[in-house]
Amino acid sequence: MADAAAPNASSMPSAKSLLDGLMRGEMGLALGVVGIIVLLIIPVPAPLLDVLLAISLTGSVLILMTAILIKKPLEFTSFPTVLLVTTLFRLGLNIASTRLILSHGQEGTGGAGAVIEAFGHLMMQGNFVIGVIVFIILIVVNFMVVTKGSGRIAEVAARFTLDSMPGKQMAIDADLSTGLISQDEAKIRRKELEQESTFFGAMDGASKFVKGDAIAGLIITAINIIGGIIIGVVQHKMPFGDAASTYTIMTIGDGLVSQIPALIISIAAGMVVSKAGVEGSADKALTTQLAMNPVGLGMVSASSGIIALIPGMPIFPFAAMALAAGALAYKRVQDAKKPKALDPADLEAAAPSEPEEEPISASLAIDDVKIELGYGLLTLINDLDGRKLTDQIRALRKTLASEYGFVMPPVRILDNMRLANQGYAIRIKEMEAGAGEVRLGCLMCMDPRGGQVELPGEHVREPAFGLPATWIADDLREEATFRGYTVVDPATVLTTHLTEILKENMADLLSYAEVQKLLKELPETQKKLVDDLIPGTVTATTVQRVLQSLLRERVSIRDLPQILEGVGEAAPHTASVTQLVEQVRARLARQLCWANRGDDGALPIITLSADWEQAFAEALIGPGDDKQLALPPSRLQDFIRGVRDSFERAALAGEAPVLLTSPGVRPYVRSIIERFRGQTVVMSQNEIHPRARLKTVGMV
């Protein structure tokens, strides 16, 4: 007994979950589709058919009201599914009613149910020819007008929606890259864009169901009339006139009770797909737009009045329309003349009051990176072609993240009327870090050898590197390229300048919050390293200062686990950030040598002579790791001249070498060189990878 009861007990949760799912509506659609399949197979009694026909009529009206009252098509994304299910439901009802008409038609007009009989008598009014004509008119209106029109609208909407997707996607990415929207807002917009394309694509296909339903209704009606007369006359020996009258009444009633919901849902489909360009609900939009123009209303009033005066034409209907349109036109004219009345809330808002003080927090907020454009450069972001600038900024974010492991903050772009017409300014934390001018419609041309461009144009200096350049006309592009010149457009000039400024200020832009984010985004396999290091061995602030020091010398922090391991190795022996950085750089030897190698794969170096090594070592003063450089000014000038001469000779030979020093003096040599040659790389002997191939090109 216990074993027998076990299956029943185990089945109880599944039955309960099935009932709960039905109550929540999760299985309603599945059961509905199963019910439609049952209609196709099992005979349905007339009372049950009456209930199902009432559900069909009521449901179609509900769908139409929903289509009218929604504000945008995406509020009714389930409409294609609803369209398919209701079409199948009507076809199932047609088959069930056909079975009743042909099998019980000899019993009289009530053989197929009270609903079909009532519709048949209501439309025919004792004359079945009238019913046939009305039914044919409904079929023609539904098939030729409503269904065909809504299908065409759905087809065009789907095509244009799919064609516009790339542009809309680019606009979302541009707003995200410039900081106009957040990552969450971008996700919401992308999801809405995907829903829109899917919806209109589904509507394009679903409209074909409505068209097929109209054709099927016409064919089923003809079959019912012809088949019913044959069955009544041949099988049941009914007089031909009685058979024709009885079966026609039931068939027309069946056709009407099926085609009226079909027509209503076809109208709903047209409403949904035609709302793409309408703001708000359809009733408010139509009321506002049709009655807003007094000139149009006046012409309608005059036209109706003229028609009312035609001999034989009934005066009252047209005169009433003329008076109504004229009164509405007069009211619109008067409303336009008098000032708009304010409601109490508006009056309270308009009353003189003390200006609302802006929150202090809004004044404290600053933009990490900002580009200000002169009035003449607004087309760089407002025109369709202007997306090139935002696209390049987005690509720059990816490049900096890939090369340096540095996530560039959002760039805010805005206009500044105080700038020159075609000028721009780049600000880092609200401070101007660079400025320049570009020429829209022209191209910047530069000689890679550093000479002056021998083409007509405006000779200037390239803003990022200060090289000689010339703004040339666009039609000289091919000639400039043929001569071997470098040619770039205005957006690229601005982006290149922004790139160099960001590289110079990466250390300042790496905030404490950004460091915390980098640590959190490390793989799970590295979480133990972070937990062991922070805060037990070093603080997050110390890690931030180490990363800033590396970025200041343009060393990539992408290999963050390796950097943390270097910090963890040196931290027990020193608290000096300088010494921590030196230890980390030694662990990054492979990366440093690879990043600074020449075209031939060798690392070009300029060595520091023994005299200068000794001079720097003797000039270090202070206890422990907190040493300071105290080099006499005269010796400092000699060193600067020596560095310049050595690197200029290397540049003439086509080399871009690094300065190689001993580990003890490297940070102090770098602190001097960054003042006059910020991009020069200074490496110590500990940072040379054992497999690196060196090429000495000079000595200081």
Curated annotation (Swiss-Prot):
Q: Which domain of life is it from?
A: Bacteria
Keywords assigned: Bacterial flagellum biogenesis, Bacterial flagellum protein export, Cell inner membrane, Cell membrane, Membrane, Protein transport, Transmembrane, Transmembrane helix, Transport
Q: Which Pfam families match?
A: FHIPEP
What processes does the entry annotate via GO biological process terms? bacterial-type flagellum assembly; protein secretion
Where in or outside the cell?
Cell inner membrane
| GO cellular component terms attached to this protein's record | plasma membrane
Q: What is its main location?
A: membrane
Question: What InterPro entries would the database entry show?
Answer: FHIPEP_1, FHIPEP_3, FHIPEP_4, FHIPEP_CS, FlhA, T3SS_FHIPEP
Membrane-spanning parts? 27-44, 48-65, 76-93, 129-146, 218-235, 256-273, 306-323, 364-380
Quick check: keyword Cell membrane in the entry? yes
Write down the membrane topology: Multi-pass membrane protein
Q: What does this protein do?
A: Required for formation of the rod structure of the flagellar apparatus. Together with FliI and FliH, may constitute the export apparatus of flagellin.
NCBIfam families (alphabetical): FlhA
| Family affiliation | Belongs to the FHIPEP (flagella/HR/invasion proteins export pore) family.
Q: What is the protein's name according to its record?
A: Flagellar biosynthesis protein FlhA
